[in-house]
A protein has these predicted regions:
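Anionic-ligand binding patches
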Residues: 2-6, 12-199
Length: 199
């Protein structure tokens, strides 16, 4: 692959993860902000639809193929919330810490065995803005919500997401360890295999 793709995100954590995961491939990932693309509101009802909105917007502005991600945290005890509202769970201008505080408050009376959750990620790839057959790849990462924060790495809800297999929070893992088991890592591995067959 000798390609340049625009990544339809301004999230520095996601950009770093994607660039790290693709470093062994001859692919240049250009963050959309570097090409003058602004973020658009995530107005759809599902992760997949939101990712497609973002990818189409980036394609239309840049003329480049686009990769877009939509992801979030789904907590069983909260009927799948925060879900598509993960980034703005505590309000439209919420910080990651605001979101974590709200989540922990809502789970304060929930026993540890009922705090199961998963990170979900969908990655979509559009060859051009009118691509009728976008590549859509999904990944999940199963875990438990901790009662307090652990670790200083990562971003978002990572400090309160416990991986029972790794016996660590997502924020205690190195980026290499995280990419090996994360929702985004799983989705990107699928996307890479599909791209290798189609480009």
């Amino acid at each position: 692959m000798h390609e340049s793709f625009v990544f339809a995100s301004n999230n520095s954590g996601k950009i770093l993860e994607l660039q790290t995961l693709l470093q062994d491939f001859n692919v240049k990932i250009i963050p959309q902000a570097a090409l003058g693309v602004n973020e658009i509101p995530e107005t759809a009802a599902t992760f997949i639809e939101n990712a497609l909105l973002k990818a189409r917007h980036a394609c239309e502005i840049t003329g480049l193929p686009a990769i877009a991600d939509d992801s979030g945290l789904q907590v069983n005890a909260l009927h799948g919330a925060p879900g598509i509202y993960s980034a703005r769970y505590a309000g439209p201008n919420a910080t990651p810490q605001d979101n974590i505080k709200k989540l922990l408050a809502e789970l304060s009376n929930i026993a540890s065995e009922k705090r199961k959750a998963r990170f979900y990620c969908v990655l979509v790839f559009l060859r051009h803005v009118k691509d009728p057959a976008p590549l859509i790849c999904e990944g999940t990462w199963e875990g438990i919500i901790l009662p307090e924060q652990l670790g200083n790495s990562g971003f978002g809800y990572d400090p309160v997401f416990w991986d029972p297999i790794k016996k660590a929070s997502a924020a205690q893992l190195s980026i290499t360890e995280k990419n090996a088991c994360s929702h985004r890592g799983h989705a990107l591995k699928l996307l890479i295999s599909k791209l290798a067959r189609t480009l």
